[in-house]
Swiss-Prot record:
Organism name: Homo sapiens
InterPro entries (alphabetical): Acyl_CoA_acyltransferase, ODC_AZ, ODC_AZ_sf
Location of region: Disordered: 17-55
Gene name of the encoded protein: OAZ1
Protein name (Swiss-Prot/TrEMBL): Ornithine decarboxylase antizyme 1
UniProt cross-references to PANTHER family, sorted A to Z: ORNITHINE DECARBOXYLASE ANTIZYME, ORNITHINE DECARBOXYLASE ANTIZYME 1
């Protein structure tokens, strides 16, 4: 059902158009300008301790926390030996791989919420990375500020298929800053795809008054319906 709707988003002007003469090699982080979904584990046994937390920078500068322009320190992986890329690689396990995707899982102390780094291979020389959080039956994806990287339209389509077919997710949530200039275009684009605006107070999203959330719910046939 997602595949039948993907063409609407593939041609959307919200995604950067492909340019001729692309650079021969590029690995693009789609969320690089708005880092990143983060997992904060707190003490106690309440449900709050395992809830996904969407904080885009550890030390925000002036301006909204959601998309601060201040430099962001590299993510420190719990249990790692520093903030280097080497530590990041050592603290991640291969989660899934095929001819289009390579997905690694960051090791965390929280066994209820998983951080997945999704790298889609558009060509041999061009790849796009998305950092997502899988919590329960929901996958959370942050839409970065500004024009998305070239090729992100195809990359996002593959990501949705992965969420449905491999993760068997019940919901996919996207989030972006409310005050961004292309907010109306994003709402229109993802509404065409089947996403719906999430009202404040929804139990599956964090309390972020500065952020807009949209949700896509996968419709699955029950075993009883299949027998009929």
């Amino acid at each position: 059902m997602v595949k039948s709707s993907l063409q609407r988003i593939l041609n959307s002007h919200c995604f950067a158009r492909e340019k001729e003469g692309d650079k021969p090699s590029a690995t693009i982080h789609a969320s690089r300008t708005m880092p990143l979904l983060s997992l904060h584990s707190r003490g106690g046994s309440s449900s709050e301790s395992s809830r996904v937390s969407l904080h885009c920078c550890s030390n925000p500068g002036p301006g909204p926390r959601w998309c601060s322009d201040a430099p962001h320190p590299p993510l420190k992986i719990p249990g790692g030996r520093g903030n280097s890329q080497r530590d990041h690689n050592l603290s991640a396990n291969l989660f899934y791989s095929d001819d289009r995707l390579n997905v690694t899982e960051e090791l965390t102390s929280n066994d209820k919420t998983r951080i997945l780094n999704v790298q889609s291979r558009l060509t041999d020389a061009k790849r796009i990375n998305w950092r997502t959080v899988l919590s329960g039956g929901s996958l959370y994806i942050e839409i970065p500020g500004g024009a998305l990287p070239e090729g992100s339209k195809d990359s996002f389509a593959v990501l949705l298929e992965f969420a449905e077919e491999q993760l068997r997710a019940d919901h996919v949530f996207i989030c972006f800053h409310k005050n961004r200039e292309d907010r109306a275009a994003l709402l229109r684009t993802f509404s065409f795809l089947g996403f719906e605006i999430v009202r404040p107070g929804h139990p599956l999203v964090p309390k972020r008054p500065d952020a807009c959330f949209m949700a896509y719910t996968f419709e699955r046939e029950s075993s009883g319906e299949e027998e009929e």
